[in-house]
A protein has these predicted regions:
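Cytochrome P450 I-helix active-site segment
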Residues: 68, 172, 176, 232, ...
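Cytochrome P450 heme-thiolate monooxygenase catalytic core
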Residues: 127-136, 170-326, 344
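Cytochrome P450 heme-binding "Cys pocket" and the immediately downstream C-terminal segment
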Residues: 184, 191, 218-219, 339-342, ...
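N-terminal membrane-proximal hinge/A-helix region immediately C-terminal to the signal-anchor transmembrane segment
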Residues: 2-154, 176-185, 205, 278-284, ...
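Short, small-residue alpha-helix embedded
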Residues: 323-336, 468
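Cytochrome P450 heme-thiolate "Cys pocket" and heme-binding signature region
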Residues: 157, 314, 319, 360-365, ...
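Conserved cytochrome P450 K-helix/beta-meander segment immediately N-terminal to the heme-binding cysteine loop
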Residues: 393, 398, 412-438
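Conserved, non-catalytic sequence blocks in retroelement Pol enzymes and Pol-derived host proteins
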Residues: 60-64, 81-83, 165-169, 361-368, ...
Length: 505
């Protein structure tokens, strides 16, 4: 099984980029002289970028990297725009070594030793960098996007009760109920005997589960068989838009503009860009669901509270739906394309379920090989493939023998760590057994981040992935249409699709 990028002309992310920028600019300028406007804009951006380098460059000058990256963040922004940032950074590490300059003030450190330094705890630990400002929703930083430690601690205390062990135990029956809706739709595909894109249905499932948690009621994508949601932006009439496309465009735009401060300023000042429209659409979706489910009134004194809750709800929908749906799709694909793993896992699941074609989460979680298979899928695919940005604290820090002054941007590339031969031995092989061999492998799994800013919802994600994959494998025989999995990257690394055919066991 290989992970393969599609031809450049077919990249879904390139279409995202065109939708985010080019059509809107044509609309604004009436299609006249768009090339000149774009060229002038790029020249101005390059000039400002180089000027910015001279003003803020702080990090060790001797660290090598691509020539353009030494002088401007546009090298990294370009690869993010093309949906191949993690590949470009990985290639740079293969050429230049453990430490690579991927921006004038941004050093990528491909070393396991760097994880505890860059993503560590305590008052001297690096904080999130300005990169995360591009993810701010509704003008209110969420638990994910806030850079302030105290604000993050406050938000985490407020939100953490929803992800506590007791709260998740109460939520498990609701997850199983939603999985029931999911299997009803899969049964329909069984009867047809046709290939279908299960990634879409994983997305619908994730949205329904997370909206139930965030708002107290499901959006209902599984039942309607569509991700169309009603959106009404300020001053506009109500329209129906695809929620998955909104998530993809918003997340991809944020991953690009967060790299460069001038891009953030320019893009934020252009509300007509469809990437910004995607952001406003998600904010409106979260606000409407919140008001409908919880009875909030935006005209009341609680309007600020609604904005705060909307920011958290939108963050939960985006991060949760992307992580779980993509991870379930690639893990199912890895299982189905590795007969040895498929046969071994099925034997263990059938034994644990006493030969039945269904099992509870409580039963499934006690099958260690299932969780090992999920961890291996998370490692090999690397749902979060990029390095998560941090800023060196006041007084600077020492990492891997190098001193970095205050404000230096640092990151550890998740894809490169997940495919490190010294760590894994055979990193390109799908081998779940590595997670059961007694090694401390879990500390190098970066799918949910690392340290005090790691994803607060990762336990919920595991509950969902374990429950869903156990259900599918016990209930159906799975056949994939292609041995290759084509992927793209925004902030998350995701498959373009996952075509399978099911038959009942």
């Amino acid at each position: 099984m290989t992970i393969k990028f599609p031809p450049r002309s077919d990249w879904r992310h390139f279409n995202f980029a065109e939708r985010m920028f080019l059509p809107d600019l044509n609309e604004v300028f009436g299609g006249r002289g768009i090339g000149l406007y774009a060229l002038a804009f790029l020249l101005l951006l390059c000039g400002l970028s180089v000027l910015h380098t001279f003003l803020v460059r702080k990090s060790a000058h001797h660290i090598p990297g691509p020539l353009l990256a030494r002088w401007t963040n546009l090298w990294l922004a370009y690869h993010a725009y093309r949906g191949r940032r993690y590949k470009a950074v990985h290639a740079a590490h293969q050429r230049y070594g453990v430490m690579v300059r991927i921006g004038p003030n941004h050093i990528s450190v491909a070393s396991p030793e760097a994880l505890s330094v860059i993503y560590g705890q305590g008052p001297r630990a690096p904080a999130k960098s300005p990169f995360y400002d591009s993810f701010v929703c509704n003008g209110k930083p969420s638990i994910f996007s806030t850079r302030d430690r105290q604000d993050h601690s406050t938000k985490r205390r407020v939100v953490s009760h929803a992800f506590s062990s007791s709260a998740l135990q109460e939520f498990i029956p609701l997850i199983h109920s939603t999985i029931g809706d999911f299997t009803q739709r899969l049964d329909e595909f069984c009867l047809k005997g046709e290939y279908f894109d299960v990634l879409l249905w994983f997305n619908y499932l994730a949205f329904d589960v997370l909206s139930d948690l965030a708002f107290g009621e499901r959006i209902g994508m599984l039942k309607q068989g569509s991700d169309l949601v009603e959106i009404q932006r300020a001053g506009e009439s109500s329209v129906h838009e695809n929620a998955i496309a909104l998530v993809d465009e918003r997340e991809h735009l944020a991953a690009i503009v967060g790299i460069h401060p001038f891009l953030q300023v320019v893009v934020n000042s252009l509300p007509f860009l469809s990437g910004n429209k995607a952001t406003s659409g998600l904010e409106e979706l979260g606000r409407r669901q919140l008001i409908a489910a919880r009875g909030y009134d935006v005209r009341s004194p609680n309007a600020d509270e609604v904005a705060e809750l909307t920011a958290e709800a939108v963050t939960l929908l985006i991060a949760g739906s992307d992580t779980t749906s993509n991870s379930m799709a690639v893990t199912l694909h890895f299982i189905a394309t590795n007969p040895r793993v498929y046969t071994k896992l099925m034997g263990l699941l059938l034994e644990a379920s006493s030969g039945q074609n269904e099992m509870s989460y409580e039963q499934a979680k006690d099958v260690p090989y299932l969780q090992a298979t999920i961890n291996e899928g998370l490692r090999l695919h690397s749902t979060t493939a990029i390095g998560l940005h941090r800023s060196a604290p006041p007084g600077g820090l020492v990492c891997c023998g190098h001193f970095f002054p205050e404000g230096t941007e640092l990151s550890v590339p998740a894809w490169t760590i997940g495919h490190d031969t010294e760590l894994w031995g055979d990193p390109d092989v799908f081998r779940p057994e590595r997670w059961l061999e007694g090694k401390e492998s879990r500390q190098y799994l970066l799918a949910f981040g690392k340290g005090p800013r790691a994803c607060i919802g990762q336990n919920l994600a595991y509950i969902e992935m374990i429950s869903v994959l156990a259900t599918i494998l016990l209930r159906y025989k799975v056949e994939v249409r292609s041995q290759e999995l084509q992927t793209t990257e925004g902030f998350m690394h995701k498959p373009l699709d996952c075509w399978i055919k099911l038959s009942r066991r």
